[in-house]
Amino acid sequence: METVSSVPVFARKNVAYAGATLCCLLWGSSYPAIKSGYELFAIATDDIPSKIVFAGYRFLFAGLLLLLFAMAQRKPIARLSLQQYGQIALLGLTQTSIQYIFFYIGLAFTTGVKGSIMNATGTFFSVLLAHLIYKNDRLSYNKSIGCVLGFAGVMLVNVNHSLLDFSFSAMGDGFVVLAAFILSASMLYGKRISQTVDPTVMTGWQLAFGGGVLVLGGYLTGGTLVVHSATAVALLGYLTLLSSIAFALWSVLLKYNRVSMIAPFNFVIPVAGTVLSAIFLGENILEMKYAIALVLVCSGIWWVNKPKA
C-alpha cells in the first residue's frame, strides 16, 4: 500500500486540483491582458498576422524563460536524443503554432461568444481521446454529467443575442473547433513525451520552437509589432510569465494524473476570463449569470472527480 509520502507531490489530489485551478485562472487572466495588449501595441482587430507575431513572442519568451529556469535547477536541457528533439518539435508545431493559427483565423470569422463556446469543446475531445488511449481513463456516467455541466456554464457566461445565430461557419466556428481538437490531441501527446523528458524542459523547448514558428510566420505574412511604451513591454512580460508557469505546471499535472481528471478544469478559463475582463476592463460584472456559471463549472469538475460509490 502506498503511503502519502510515497506519492509524487503533483499526483496528490489536493495539489492537482489547486494546480489546475491556478493554471486556468492564469489563462483566464490572459483574456483582458491580450485585449489590452492589442491596444498598447496598436494591433487592429482584423490584423491577424500581427496578432500571430504578438502571440509568437509571448510563447517564444515563455519557452526561453522555462529553459533558463530549468538550467538554474541544474536540469540538463540539451541532453536529448534526436528522436526526443523531433517529438518536442512536433509538439511545439501542433500545440503552439498550428493550433493558434487555426484559432486566430477562426476567431476572425465568427463572434467572440461562439468562439469561446466552440473552444470549450476541447475538454470533450480530451476526455474522449483519453477514453480511447488509456485503459485507466475510461468515460463514465459521472464524467459525462460533469462535462455537460461545465459546458453549460461556459454557454451561460456567454449568453447574449448572438447565441440565437445557429449558423455554422467552416472557416470560423470550424477552425476554432479544429484548434480545440489539435490542442487536446497535442496535450495527450505531451503527456506521453513527459514520461521520458522532464516536463519543464519539454514545455520550454516546445514553447520556444512553436513561438518562433509563429513569429516567423506572422512576419512573413505582413505582421508587425512596434513597442510604443514601457507599459506594453510590462504587459508582454506578464503574458510571458503566466504562459511559462501555466503551461509547465499543466504538463506536470498531466504527467502524474489522468487526463479526464485535469481537463475539465479548462471550463474555468472562459468564466474566469469573462469575470476578470469585467473587473480590469470596466465591464459589467454584477450579473447573476456569472455566479450561476461558476457554480455549474465547479459542479461539473466535482462530478468528473467524484469518487465511485
Tell me what each language-model feature is.
Residues 28, 32, 60, 92-97, ...:
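Hydrophobic/small/kink-forming positions within alpha-helical transmembrane segments
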Residues 66, 128-129, 141-160, 267, ...:
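Hydrophobic transmembrane alpha-helices of multi-pass small-molecule transport proteins
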Residues 40-95, 125-129, 182-186, 203-221:
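Transmembrane alpha-helices of multi-pass small-molecule transport proteins
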Residues 1-53, 93, 165-192, 212, ...:
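Glycine-/small-residue-enriched transmembrane alpha-helix faces in small-molecule transporters
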Residues 57, 96, 114-121, 189-212, ...:
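Helix-helix packing/entry segments at the starts of transmembrane helices
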Residues 71-115, 119, 156, 239-257:
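Specific transmembrane alpha-helical segments of multi-pass solute transporters/efflux pumps
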Residues 37, 54, 106, 132-139, ...:
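Hydrophobic/aromatic residues within transmembrane alpha-helices
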Residues 12-17, 47-50, 80-85, 159-182, ...:
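Juxtamembrane helix-entry segments on the extracytoplasmic side of multipass membrane proteins
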